[in-house]
Amino acid sequence: MDYNFNLEHPFFFTNNDYSTDTSIKYQVSLPFNWHEVMNNDEWVYQYPIGKFVERQGWKIHISSEYNSSHELLQDVAKICHEMRIPFKHLSTEDKFIMRNGKLVSRGFSGKFITCYPNQNELESVLQRLESALKQYNGPYILSDKRWDEAPIYLRYGVFRPSRDDEKKVAIDELIVGDEVVKDERLPVFKIPKGIVPPDFLNKWLDKKDKKQGDFPFIIDNAIRFSNSGGIYNARLKEDGKKIILKEARPYTGLGFDGTYSSEKLASECKALKILNEWSETPKIYWHGKIWEHTFLGIEHMKGVPLNRWVTNNFPLYEVVDKTKDYLLRVSKIVEKLIDLTNKFHSENVYHQDLHLGNILVKDEDEISIIDWEQAVFSNDEKVVHKVAAPGFRAWRETLPSEIDWYGIRQIAHYLYMPLVTTSDLTYNYVSQTRIEGKKLFESLGYTREHIDYVESLLSYLDSKCPQIENISRKKVLKSMHEIRTIESEQDIQDFIIKLLRGFTLTYGQWRKEFQSRFFPVHYYGLNFNQGIAFSDLAILWSYQQLAKKVKNFKFDDYYEIRTQVINEAVNNFKKSSLSGLFDGKIGTIWLIYEFGEIDRAVELFTTHFIEIFENSQNKNLYSGQAGILLVGLYFLSKGEIDNKLGEEILIRLREYTLNYIENPETFCKVGASDVQSNDPYENFGGLLYGHAGVAWLFGEAYKLTGESIYKNGLELAVDKELVAYKVDSN
C-alpha cells in the first residue's frame, strides 16, 4: 500500500499536508474562455470552457527531466491551448521530484503532464507534440508505450467521471460495449480487452521500442524492483560467473538533491573502482549501457546481513549461550569495521549509508560492505544525511566522514543491545541501551574483561560523532539513564503510571497542533481511522486497559474524550471502505462493544454484518473474512443477536471452512513469504495474515459448536502454517 506521510515533524508521523510546499510552482498562462482548477495539491487542470470531452480514450502522458521541466510545460501548454485540448500538470517541483523518486509506484511514476484529446484529435495533437518535444528527455512511463522519439507516451484509460446522462461507473472503470472493465494502472503497457484502436495506432502498436546491443549476462531472478530499476541475481554469459546486477533507468530515482538513479549507480561504480583491491568490497565484472538503461554487474558477496547474524547469535538466554563467545565475536566485527572505515576514508571515499543491511558476515565472522550508491568523494563541506535506515540517520548537518562514523557507532551499539531505531527520535538513545546491554551480559556470566573491552569500543565510536545541544524548536529529547529493576508489584504500578503520564503528555502535545484525529499513530494508520490496529478508538481502548492495572490514576477529561472518540467512529462508520478486524468496520464494532456501548455495537453489527462480510476481499484475520467471522462468533457467544442473524453467520462460517479445506492455498500463502515487511498489506504469514489466524477462527468455532468440520479445519490450518517454519537448532 502507498502511504501518504510526512517526516518533517520532530515527534509525530503526519499526513503530507502537514508541511507547506514552498518549492517552485509550475505555472502556465490561462487563455480567454479557459478554466483552471486544482482539485488536490498535486495536479493543476486546465480545460476549454464549453468543450465536450469524451469519458475515456487514449491519454497522452508526457515525462520530463527535472532541469528542463518548466520549458517543456510551456511548449506543451501552447499546443494544447491552440488545439483546445484539456490537460493537467504537476503543481510544484517537490511534487515532480516525488513522482520521479525511487520508491514511487512504478504504475504512476514519470507522469508530468497528461493531455485528454478526443479520438478525432489524437493523431494531429501527437504529431504536433512530437515535433515540438524532440529535443527533450524524460523517464520511460512503464504503464504506457512510447509514441516516437520525444518523451510522449500513450495508454487507454478514463478521462473524467461519468455525467448524469451516462452510465454510472466508478472513476477507475471503463465502459467497453456493454461491459464494465477495470482501468488498471500497472507498470506494464496493456490495452483493455475489447478496445479497438484507431487505424493509425495499429502500426505504432506493432512497432518495437528501439533496443541496442545484446545482454552479456543471463538474469536468473529479481531480488527487488523499484521505480529506478531492478536488482537481479545474474550470470555472465562469457564464463557463467555469478553476479549481482544493478539496473538504473534514465531520469528516475530523482532525489531532492537533484540526482538521478543513474548518477547514484555511477557513484557506486566509481567507489568500487577506487576500492578494487579490497577483498571486503565487491569487484566490478561488467558496467555499461544497454538500450537506455545503465547496468552494473558486481561480485556476489558471500554472507548474511549483519541484522540476521545478530538474530542468529544474540544471547538472550543462558541456556543457549554456553560458549560465552558473543562479545569476542562482536569485538572482532567492530574492530574490522573501524579499520575498514579508516581505510576507505584514506582513499577519500565516504559510504553515507552504513547500516546493518549493508554489512555482510560470512564464515569466521569475516565482513564485507556493500551498496555504495550514496558514496561521495569529498569531505570538505557539511551535508544533511538524506538517505538512512531507521535508527541510523546522523543528526544535523555534519561532515560525510562523521556520517559514516555515526553509522558504525549505531551498528556497534546494536550488536551490544539490538534496540537503536528510537535513535531517530531521542538523541543519544544508545546511551540507554548500553546500560541495559551491560546488565544483560553481566547476568549471563560474561567476564568483566570482555564487557569492558566492548564498552571501550563503544566509547571510542561515541567520541567519533559530534555532540549537539539543540535540534529543533524543541529541546533535544534526552534518553533515560535510570536503571530500572522490576522487583515488586509497586514497581510495576510505578512503571505503568509513568507510561500513562507519557500518554497524556503526548496526547496534549498532539492536540495542540492537530485536529484530524485524537491521537498520533504510526504512518500505516494515518489514512484510516477504523479497526483495532491504528484507530483512535483502539488507542484509547489500549490506554483504558493499561489504566485498569493501577489504582486511582486520573486522566482529565477521559470520559468526555471517550464519548467524542466513539461518536466520531460511529459518524464516520459508513465512510470507511475497509471491513476488517484490524483496519475496518468490524473491528470498530467490537471496540464499541468493549467500551460498554452494547446497544450501539449490537445495532451496528446487526445492520451491517452481511454487507461487511460480502464486501471483504481478503480471507485473513487482519483485514479479511476470518476476522469478521471471529467477531461474529464473539457476538453469538454473548447472546446479543437474534437467531436469524446467528444462522446467517454460521452459514457463512461453514461455507468459508469448506472452501478452506478444499483449497487452503487460495486463502493464504503456504510456505515462507516472498517479502519480509512490517507493512500489514505486504505480509502473508503468521497469526494476523496467514493460516494461524484462520486456525484461531476454526478453534473458536469448534469450541462454540463442537462440530468436527471446524476441528478438521483447525488441524489443516496449523499444518499449512507450519510449512513456513524451521526448527531452531538452539
Task: Please state what every model-predicted region is.
Residues 2-23, 166-221:
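Juxta-kinase regulatory segment immediately upstream of eukaryotic protein kinase catalytic domains
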Residues 24-45, 50-52, 195-238:
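ATP-binding glycine-rich phosphate-binding loop
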Residues 120, 125-193, 410, 414-514:
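Helical subdomain adjoining the active site within ATP-dependent kinase catalytic cores
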Residues 341-361:
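Catalytic-loop of the protein kinase fold
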Residues 270-281:
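Structural motif at the C-terminus of the N-lobe alphaC helix and the adjacent alphaC-beta4 loop
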Residues 283-294:
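Short beta-strand micro-motifs within the conserved protein kinase catalytic domain, predominantly
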Residues 55-66, 218-269:
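ATP-binding glycine-rich loop module of kinase domains
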Residues 373-440:
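C-lobe/activation-segment region of protein kinase-like
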